[in-house]
Amino acid sequence: MDLFYRESGAGDPIIILHGLFGTSDNWQIIAKKMGETHRIITADLRNHGQSFHSDEFGYGLMAGDVERLIDHLELDQPLIVGHSMGGKVAMRSSFLFPDKISKIISVDMGPKYYPVRHERIINALKSARIADAESRQDVDNQLSELIPQTGERLFLMKNLKRKKEGGFEWKMNLEVIAEKIENLGEAIHSGDIVLTPTLFLRGSESDYILDSDEVEILKHFPNSRIETIEGAGHWVHADKPEELMEAIYDFI
């Protein structure tokens, strides 16, 4: 299997897909908790975490990787939960192989076009001299010049891998992500309509899914609904994990 993945629990299967610059590690607390009632599979998407690097990067390709994971594990119509970029992968999956999926949950990501918001992060990651860094604190100090938010830096630094000869490297395929970043803003194709039951979960403090997006969402996903988790920003699973799990269980 090309994708790196982790499993926990037993029962009806749920696949969890992380967002841009994320890894399956970001969801392990939730995966462990939900593993008490379900079989949870958290995967590293291509060019992220411990999964393979490729010069090709886009939603159709990532959805194809997910389909191969479903086939490899012989999963019977899993629920797919995707955050941000992972939400778009879940949507694309529901278009490409709807018969293999029971439901999808898109966490703070709609089907519309999104302007690229990550230039600052990419510039910070590319400018950091991690190959010569002596410690994670050294990398943190470098990143802080462009990324003042401590939590954001700690999230990004989960991608650091120490080299045997000293210094660090990024687990993610930073060059390809930077080159193909525009692909991640693309909207769902205008004619795509899927009846897969779908939940769009948004954070009340995030602007990724707006009230005005409801018409577009229902156009592509007529069997869907939008719910808001109060007090959560874009990183819903980090801000309000208990409320997120409750919403997932209610939808199941």
What is each residue range found by the language model?
Residues M1-I15, G35-H38, L75-D76, E182, ...:
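Alpha/beta-hydrolase fold catalytic core
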Residues G19-G22, S84:
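Active-site glycine-rich loops that stabilize anionic/oxyanionic intermediates
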Residues F21-I29:
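Serine-hydrolase catalytic-loop signature spanning alpha/beta hydrolases and amidase-signature enzymes
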Residues Q28-G35, I41-G82, E246:
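Active-site loop/oxyanion-hole signature of alpha/beta-hydrolase fold enzymes
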Residues D76-R117:
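Conserved hydrolase catalytic core segment
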Residues V116, A131-G185:
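Conserved alpha/beta-hydrolase catalytic His-Asp/Glu region
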Residues E165-H220, R225-T228:
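Conserved serine/cysteine hydrolase catalytic core
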Residues S224-I252:
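Catalytic active-site module of serine/aspartate enzymes centered on a nucleophile-bearing elbow/loop
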